[in-house]
């Protein structure tokens, strides 16, 4: 590991000397870029992530001197992937630089890819407002028109919103995805999942009347929904909430989970509902 660091520092020093010297046209930047790239690879082998990130930023600057925004963007992305392991703030900063350069050269797919990475980093840091912001950018990078965003991006925004206890926003998005999908042969099989997600968010609000009204709407939207395990789960959970019965709530979740494992997001939200239900049950016990 020490050898890799020593080699990396040697390449980096040689690159700095190239930049400080005189050369025709852009050759010194080309030579320095090659050396910085080698230095970055050495630092990565040594798992010296801060050094690797810093040297890739220097590499990006060389590419900018050579008027190559594409290569500069790639170098910033490489820097970010190193910083991800040691410095989230720097990782986000480098990804933002990469996005800006990809937008400049019209590489919208690459911009969207790195917006997604930024959103995931903010989610990791529990900064859900920022995660939502960058997930929105991912929908249609470089444009104000978000009229037909991909369902996966919208789903992520809805999930972040629910995690942040912004349930009405999450419900609105999940229901819109379901409406958009129900008449699409490729997407219609996912409708029950979106309606389940919307229903769980309804449960988090804790008011039984809107939950039951929502279930009626969902069955009108998709007539097949009433015969699904997802619908049965929501009906059983709504009944448990109405009866303030924690055991009934737990049994309904266990029954569903035994056949279709609940993911972490759904589990987190259902635990919130259960804790609220427990608190109500204890309150009732105290009163009696």
From Swiss-Prot:
The keyword Magnesium belongs to this UniProt entry's keyword annotation: no
GO molecular function: soluble NSF attachment protein activity; syntaxin binding
Organism: Solanum tuberosum (Potato)
CDD domains, per database record: SNAP
Domain of life: Eukaryota
Keywords: ER-Golgi transport, Membrane, Protein transport, Transport
Name of this protein: Alpha-soluble NSF attachment protein
Compartment(s) where it occurs, according to its Swiss-Prot or TrEMBL record: Membrane
Family matches, as InterPro entries: NSF_attach, TPR-like_helical_dom_sf
Keyword Nucleotide-binding found: no
PANTHER family given in the database record: ALPHA-SOLUBLE NSF ATTACHMENT PROTEIN, SOLUBLE NSF ATTACHMENT PROTEIN SNAP
GO CC, any one term: SNARE complex
Topology with respect to the bilayer: Peripheral membrane protein
Family: Belongs to the SNAP family.
Record's function text: Required for vesicular transport between the endoplasmic reticulum and the Golgi apparatus.
Gene Ontology biological process: intracellular protein transport; SNARE complex disassembly
């Amino acid at each position: 590991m020490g050898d890799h660091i020593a080699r990396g520092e040697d390449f980096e020093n040689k690159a700095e000397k190239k930049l400080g010297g005189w050369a025709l046209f852009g050759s010194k930047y080309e030579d320095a870029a090659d050396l910085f790239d080698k230095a970055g690879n050495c630092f990565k082998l040594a798992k010296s992530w801060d050094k690797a990130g810093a040297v890739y930023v220097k590499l990006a600057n060389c590419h900018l001197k050579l008027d190559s925004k594409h290569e500069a963007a790639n170098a910033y992305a490489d820097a970010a992937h190193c910083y991800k392991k040691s410095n989230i703030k720097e990782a986000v900063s480098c990804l933002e630089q990469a996005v800006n350069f990809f937008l400049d050269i019209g590489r919208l797919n690459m911009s969207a890819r790195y917006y997604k990475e930024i959103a995931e980093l903010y989610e990791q840091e529990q900064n859900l407002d920022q995660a939502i912001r960058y997930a929105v950018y991912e929908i249609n990078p470089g444009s104000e028109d978000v009229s037909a965003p991909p369902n996966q991006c919208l789903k992520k925004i809805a999930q972040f919103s629910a995690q942040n206890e912004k349930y009405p926003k999450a419900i609105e998005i999940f229901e819109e995805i379901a409406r958009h999908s129900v008449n699409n042969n490729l997407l219609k099989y996912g409708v029950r999942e979106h309606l389940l997600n919307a229903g769980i968010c309804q449960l988090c609000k804790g008011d039984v009347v809107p939950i039951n009204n929502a279930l009626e709407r969902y069955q009108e939207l998709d007539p097949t929904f009433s015969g699904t395990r997802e619908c049965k789960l929501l009906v059983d959970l709504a009944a448990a909430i109405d009866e303030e019965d924690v055991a009934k709530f737990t049994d309904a979740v266990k029954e569903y989970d035994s056949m279709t494992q609940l993911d972490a997001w759904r589990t987190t939200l259902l635990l919130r509902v259960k804790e609220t239900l427990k608190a109500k049950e204890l309150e009732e016990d105290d009163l009696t």
